[in-house]
Amino acid sequence: PTRGNDCGMFHYLTEAGIPFSRLHDVGGYFGGGRFVDIPNLFPDPDADPADPASYRFGFTDLLVTELMKSGTEPFFRLGVTIENEWAVYAARIWPPRDSLAWAKICEGVIRHYTEGWADGFHYPIRYWEIWNEPDNVPDPMENPMWRGSAEQFFELYATASTYLKEKFPHLKIGGYGSCGFYGVTGGNVPTYAATSPRFDYFRTFFDDFLAYVKAHNCPLDFFSWHSY
């Protein structure tokens, strides 16, 4: 939406036949403070995930409803938006204190939009993505998306994906919105796709993630990455 809650341009989605819209960086410059992100939907991390009163769905309800009216299915990212001011203060990009509690919050979000829970909806939203770009920077203290180690993210993914897939076996649970594979060589990758320590980390993170998922038998219905 523009100017906070204006969805007047969404008709272009219909006219262009856009099938999906990924819900990330929503509602203003790099995300705003109202839409989609788990801290926006569930502002008090100590509240009860089973209590509808713990959630603030209003802004995201508007967004999702207008997308569905436009014939565009949300590709729902569960997590937070980028914090480009991390050097001043990193607010929401730390690993959740309790991975299972976080997964239960995500369960409430999914039930609200697909099962009508908490005065919600029965929308056919199929894809639920855990986090975004936890591999953004090798040093966690300089990472604008994930202020934790790779292992901490793998544990969060394992806990959340396993829990959510048990609750919603018919939905697609995956992740993690990788930065991409700029450092890959060979095949059809152009020679100017030079590597760097950061790009190498993208690949290392990916390899270690897949190894962890396999070792722990975690659900991975899809893997998402970016092609900047």
Locations of regions flagged by a protein language model:
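Mature N-terminal, pre-catalytic/accessory segment of carbohydrate-active enzymes
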Residues: P1-P19, H24
